[in-house]
Amino acid sequence: MLISQTPFWSGWFRAPKMETALIPDFDRKIEGICRECTREKITAFAGVPSWNLVLMRRVLEYTGKSNLLEVWPDLEFFAHGGVAFTPYRKSFAKLIPSEGMTYLETYNASEGFFALADDLTRDDMLLMLDYGTYYEFRSGEQIVPLEGVRVGEVYAMIVTSINGLWRYEIGDTVEFTSTNPYRCLLYTSPSPR
């Protein structure tokens, strides 16, 4: 888990405590987070949308509040990744009824960090080209290098480590919206097309 590798000083700016975040039992972890964090000034969340929905709904049950702004009035930012956010957008808007809430989508996986929303007025993400990953894409049976992708086409993503020791089709599909710079929309398999 990445959280166990963070520097000691990050604990000054985050909640819950490291011990709580690392509880292996999911239900005990959720309860611990509710006990600790409902008394904190929380301004941001980060993580996988599905997991955060479970947590946020439990926080509302725990506190008896109707939305998260009643618990954390300064909540303004959610950085999310791991899955496409579109299916979760309405649920989050209901839990956090704020026009000022900022959602930052990232495309990360166990294999690496691939893209992020660098322009919050757009739905697509900027592909990270200098993070130690070699990209290829599969369209049917054809393998396409990054420089060969076409806007509007849906591809299965293949990543290779920079040292070439492993190559892996990660199971997600992307649609390129631009090739200068490379921007894409993320779909969880199968693609919507």
Report each predicted region and the residues it spans:
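Active-site glycine/GP-rich loop and adjacent strand/helix microenvironment
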Residues: 2-189, 193
